[in-house]
Amino acid sequence: MDELPFGEAAVEQALDELGELDAALLTDIQDMLQLINNQDSDFPGLFDSPYAGGGAGDTEPTSPGANSPESLSSPASLGSSLEAFLGEPKATPASLSPVPSASTALKMYPSVPPFSPGPGIKEEPVPLTILQPPAAQPSPGTLLPPSFPPPPLQLSPAPVLGYSSLPSGFSGTLPGNTQQPPSSLSLASAPGVSPISLHTQVQSSASQQPLPASTAPRTTTVTSQIQRVPVVLQPHFIKADSLLLTTVKTDTGATMKTAGISTLAPGTAVQAGPLQTLVSGGTILATVPLVVDTDKLPIHRLAAGSKALGSAQSRGEKRTAHNAIEKRYRSSINDKIVELKDLVVGTEAKLNKSAVLRKAIDYIRFLQHSNQKLKQENLALRNAAHKSKSLKDLVSACGSAGGTDVAMEGVKPEVVDTLTPPPSDAGSPSQSSPLSLGSRGSSSGGSDSEPDSPVFEDSQVKAQRLHSHGMLDRSRLALCALVFLCLTCNPLASLFGWGIPGPSSASGAHHSSGRSMLEAESRDGSNWTQWLLPPLVWLANGLLVLACLALLFVYGEPVTRPHTSPAVHFWRHRKQADLDLARGDFAQAAQQLWLALQALGRPLPTSNLDLACSLLWNLIRHLLQRLWVGRWLAGRAGGLRRDCGLRMDARASARDAALVYHKLHQLHAMGKYTGGHLIASNLALSALNLAECAGDAVSMATLAEIYVAAALRVKTSLPRALHFLTRFFLSSARQACLAQSGSVPLAMQWLCHPVGHRFFVDGDWAVHGAPQESLYSVAGNPVDPLAQVTRLFCEHLLERALNCIAQPSPGTADGDREFSDALGYLQLLNRCSDAVGTPACSFSVSSSMASTTGTDPVAKWWASLTAVVIHWLRRDEEAAERLYPLVERMPHVLQETERPLPKAALYSFKAARALLDHRKVESGPASLAICEKASGYLRDSLAAPPTGSSIDKAMQLLLCDLLLVARTSMWQRQQSPASAQVAHSASNGSQASALELRGFQQDLSSLRRLAQNFRPAMRRVFLHEATARLMAGASPARTHQLLDRSLRRRAGSSGKGGTVAELEPRPTWREHTEALLLASCYLPPAFLSAPGQQMSMLAEAARTVEKLGDHRLLLDCQQMLLRLGGGTTVTSS
C-alpha cells in the first residue's frame, strides 16, 4: 500500500505542539506503525490472488473498507514519517495485491465492549504450540516472511503462565510481575472454532528480571488453517488493569508472526492508549500498551534505546528535567513556609504565604528587641556584680533596680520575651505566636483564645509565692463603720462599767443597820479603778483602731507576686490592651483593662451598692493618706515584717493597678469608656490613692499626670462650689515634680504659668469625647484629656493676642502695652505648641503622656503669622524677617482645608511683605496682583457661614487692616516730600491711581461688613475712610470730620457719653497717632484752628510714637518738625 508523504518539518511542529508529551507514547506509536508499514513483509500473501481473487499485476486500489482512515491510512503515514525522523530502520514493503471489493466483501465488526465471561463461557489459558522455522525451505501452507533489517533489540521468548511464550505475544503477569515491553501480535482465526479467551491483569509486584535479548531476530510460527474470507475488527480499547482479547478459534491453528520489539527509553512512562486490532484475511493484528520498569533492564539495552531515541527525546527530556527541578524547588519553598508557619502561628492557623512571612518578620523584630533588652540588663547586672562586694549587695541592687517605671516590672526577662508579639494587621488571628502566654482558666475573649503557653504551665508556677487576694471594698467600708461605731459609742467603757461594781453599788451591797467600820477603807480601794479604767478603755479602743487599720492597709491590700498565675494573667490582658489601644479599638482595650484589674484582685464595682462602697472607701483612704497614716501603713502592705522583696512586690502591684485605673479614667474622660460621673470619680481616686502608695515605683511624670487627671475630674464632674479642689490637686502635682527632679514636665509647664493656672481653674471650657475640628490647632492624643485641654489653652492664647490688638483694654492701651502683651501671649503659645501630645505617641498603659510630647504645627504657624504682623505694625522689620521662613511654610493641613481664611492669611502676608519692604524702591504690578488675590480670599472668608468663633473675626480684622495699611504705605511712598509740602497749601494732594483706589475701596468694604458683627472694627473704619478720601482727593471737610473722631479720644466722657462710648469704642494710641500724622500732613491749613497747631500735632504724634516704640516713624516725625520749623523761621524773618 502507498505511504502518505509526511515531512520532517511537520513532525517537528507536531512535537512542539505536544509539549510535555511523554517519550513512552512516541515509542508505542513507533511500534504500532512499524508493524503496519511492514505488513507486506510480514504477510506477503495477504492480498494475493488466493485471498483476493485478482491477478498479481493488478494495480487497482484496495477496498475502502479495508483501508479506512480509522485503521490503516493515518497510522501508516504517521509511522513512516516518525521512522524517518527517529532514524529507525525502515523495511521496504513488497508489492501488494489489492483485493477487489466485489470478491472480498470485507465485513466490519462493531466495537466489542470489555469482555465479561458469560454463563456459558469458561475462562482457561490455552497453550499455543511454538514452532521454530526451518532453516531451509518452508513447508507449504505457512507464511514466509520477507527479509528485513532486524529491530534494535528483541526479547527472547519465554513461557508465561496463561499466555503464548512468543516475543510478539501479549504482555501478561509474569511470576515476578515484570512488565514487558509492548509488541505486535498477528492471529489468524477461522469460523467454526470455539472462542478462546486470553485475559491479563497488570499487577504491581516485581521479582523476575526480563530475559536478555537474542542476537538475531527470531520468527515464531503457529500453523493453522486460514479461512479465505478476511475479517476486519474495529479497534478495541483495553484498560490497563484488565486486558482482554477475544479471538475466534480456527480449525487447526493460527499463524503468528512477530515484529521487532522496541525498547523504552529510560525514565519514560507509557500512557494508556487504545488497542488497535487489525484483521486482514484471517490474521488479527493488535498492539497493547505496556509499562516497562527501566530500572530493572540491563545497561546495554538501555543504552541501545537511548541512542535510537536521543535526538527525538532531547527536547522533551530537557523540559521534563527543568519541570522536575522547578517542582522540587517549589516543594522545598512550600515546605519551609509551612514549617515557618508552624513555628510562628501554630499548626492550626490558616494563613497564606504573604501573611506567614509578615508574621515571621514581626516576630523576628520582636525577638531582636527582646534580645537587645536582655543584653542591656545582663550588662547592667554584670557591672553591678563587679562593683558589689557580696551577694547580698547584688541582690539588694537588683531589688532597687526594679523600682524604675518600666513596662514589665514584676516579670522576669524570659517572661517578657515569651509574650505575644504584636500582629501585623487588624485582621490577623488572635493566636499570633505559639509562644504567647496562654491561660487555661481564663473565661474571656480576646487574648484568652490563645493556646496554652509551653513555657508557663500550671505545674510550673511557683507555689511558694502566694497571691494575696485582699479585701473587697464592701468589707473595707463595713470595717470602717465598725471602727467609727466603736469610737462614738465606746462599747468597751460600757462593758467595763457593767462588769466592775461602782462605789454606790458596793456600799449598797454591804449596807446594814449597824455601823460599818471598813466602809472608808473599801471606798478608798475602789478609787484606783475609777482612775485606771478610762485609760485602759481608750487604750483598748486605740488598739482596736490600729488593728482595723492594719487589717485594712497591711493585710487587706491585694499583693500580686511575680511569676504567679494572677501575674501571668494580668500581663497577658495588659499587653492585649496595649495592642487594642494602638489599633484604636478602645472598647476592647477597656474590656482587657477590666480583666487585668480582676486578675490583680481589684474588680471594678458592678452594682450601685458596690460603687457607693468603693467611692466612700476611696474618700476615707485619701483622707487617711493626707494624714500620712494611711500612706505609712500602705507602705507595709503584705505584712509587718521587714521583707524587702515583699515590700517591692507590693509597691509594684500598687503601681500596676494605679496605671490601669488611670488609663481607664483617661478613656472615660475622652468618652471611650461608658459610665457616669461617680464611676469616673471612683477611677480617679483609686488611681491617685494607689499611685501615692506605690512610692518610688511610680515615676514623677506619671504621678503628676494622675494628679492633673484628678483635677480635671473635679473640674468636670463636681459642682462649681467644689472647684477649689482643682487648685489643691494642681499644687500637689507641682510639689511632686519639684520634690523628685526639681523640674516640671514639658507638657505641664503651662499649668505652672499664672495665665495657664488661671485658665485651668477659672476658665469656661469642657473636655469633649470627640475632638472638635479647629482651624488653629490639630487634635492631640485621642486618649489623653490633658492634650485636649492644652489645645484649648493654645487657642485661648491666640485669641488673647489678637484681642490685645483689636480691642485692647483701657488699662493696657497706654504706650506699648498692647503690642508687648500680645507678643507675650504668642511666646507662651509657641512653648505650648511644642508640648502638645501628638496622635503618634505611644498608647501603652505604662507610658506617660506628660513625658511624650510633640509639636502642633498649625498653632505654631498662626502664632508666627500674628507675631510678624505685630512687628510690622511696630515698624520692627528685623524681628519680622526672623519669622519669615516659619510663615512661608504653611502646614499641609491648612493647605488642604476648604476654608479660605488660611489662604487669605498667607497671601496677605506675601502682599504686605512686598508693599511694606522699604528696601524696594518701586512696587510693581506683581505686588498689587498678590494684594488683589488676598483681598479675594478675604471676601470669600467673610461670605462663608459664621462658625461662632471669636478668633475668626479677630483674625479677619487683623488681615483686613494689614491690607489697608500696606496700600496706604505704598501710596505714601509714591509721594515725594515736595508733594507733601504741596498738600499743606493746596486743597488737594497727590491722588492715587484708579487701580489702587479700586483695591482700597474693596478692602474698605470688607472692613465695613466685618464691623457690622464685630464692633471693635468700627474704629479702623473711620480712619481708613479718611485715608481713602485723601487718596482720592475728595472734599477735606468730610475728611476732617472722620479724622476728628480719632483726634478727640482724650476728651473726658460724661455720664451721657458712657452709652456712646459703648457703641463707639474709643480709639487706641496707635490710631490717635495715625490720625495726627494724616491731619498734619495732608489736611489744608484752613482746617487747622491755629497757626501753630500743625507743629503741636506733629510734636504730640512724635511723643506717642516714642511710647509705642516705633523708632523709624519717630525719626520721620522729627524730620517733618525740622522742615516745618525752618520754614516758619524763614517766613518770620
Curated annotation (Swiss-Prot):
Keywords: Activator, Cholesterol metabolism, Cytoplasmic vesicle, DNA-binding, Endoplasmic reticulum, Golgi apparatus, Lipid metabolism, Membrane, Nucleus, Phosphoprotein, Steroid metabolism, Sterol metabolism, Transcription, Transcription regulation, Transmembrane, Transmembrane helix, Ubl conjugation. The record marks D452, S453, L479, C480, L518, E519 as: Cleavage. PANTHER family: STEROL REGULATORY ELEMENT-BINDING PROTEIN, STEROL REGULATORY ELEMENT-BINDING PROTEIN 1. The keyword Transport does not apply. The chain crosses the membrane at residues 477-497, 536-556. It comes from Cricetulus griseus. GO terms for molecular function: chromatin binding; DNA binding; DNA-binding transcription activator activity, RNA polymerase II-specific; nuclear receptor activity; protein dimerization activity; protein kinase binding; sterol response element binding; transcription coregulator binding. Activation by cleavage is down-regulated upon activation of SIRT3-dependent PRKAA1/AMPK-alpha signaling cascade which leads to inhibition of ATP-consuming lipogenesis to restore cellular energy balance. Residues 68-78, 181-191, 203-217, 425-454 have a biased composition (Low complexity). It comes from the Eukaryota. This is Sterol regulatory element-binding protein 1. Belongs to the SREBP family. GO terms for biological process: cellular response to starvation; cholesterol biosynthetic process; circadian rhythm; fat cell differentiation; insulin receptor signaling pathway; insulin secretion; lipid biosynthetic process; mRNA transcription by RNA polymerase II. Residues 498-535 are lumenal. A motif (9aaTAD) lies at residues 27-35.
